[in-house]
A protein has these predicted regions:
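N-terminal hydrophobic/helix-forming segments and targeting peptides
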Residues: 1-197
Length: 197
């Protein structure tokens, strides 16, 4: 739930005529799920003590933990290491950190670094953390739906999501597949109804 997500929903809605934007404004709890707050991250950078940029959200959205809270401080390598996601088995990969999306009431700051970059960090160095972000609980939550009515009310639901930034196969592809299915079903008569959500 961020400005990038809202932009994606608005683009989706413009492209698929007849789809509908849904805005939920009151924070809700359904079973154990709580409506996720709007996260506005203007900047996220990790620099060394010489002020040299190591990673930034501007270069790669996956570099910062999603829903990372605001922080601006200098830390030693031992502290930084606790807030780094990396994988030696995928040395070039910037891995998506999603924990905060499911525990947004207790977010942690951090960065995702390719292992090849992580192993070059100097253990004796200090590092500058600057994440400019805030949470807006009352901004609401945006969603979209695209309905193809059939003769019956019984509905098949096709679900996709935009909550994984910069990842086509785990977000965008599912959304587009669902909406394309509805778009094509609208050209024929169907017994059942179909909803992309």
């Amino acid at each position: 739930n961020s400005k990038e997500t809202w932009k994606a929903f608005n683009l989706l809605n413009k492209f698929y005529k007849g789809s509908k934007l849904l805005k939920f404004t009151k924070p809700k709890q359904i079973n154990k799920w709580e409506m996720i707050p709007f996260w506005d991250c203007k900047k996220a950078e990790l620099r060394n003590s010489k002020n040299e940029l190591i990673v930034s959200k501007k270069k790669n959205n996956l570099s910062v933990y999603s829903f990372a809270p605001k922080i601006n401080k200098e830390v030693d390598f031992k502290t930084l290491k606790k807030h780094i996601l990396t994988d030696s088995k995928r040395p070039s990969a910037t891995i998506f950190h999603f924990r905060n999306q499911y525990r947004h009431w207790n977010p942690e700051w951090g960065f995702s670094l390719p292992y090849n970059l992580f192993k070059k960090l100097d253990k004796k160095e200090t590092y500058k953390i600057n994440i400019e972000s805030n949470f807006k609980k009352n901004k609401g939550f945006l969603q979209s739906e695209y309905l193809k009515k059939g003769r019956k009310k019984e509905t098949y639901i096709l679900i996709g999501h935009f909550d994984h930034p910069n990842q086509v196969n785990d977000g965008l592809a599912g959304v587009i597949a669902a909406y394309e299915t509805i778009k094509r079903l609208k050209k024929i008569k169907t017994k059942y109804s179909y909803l992309a959500f």
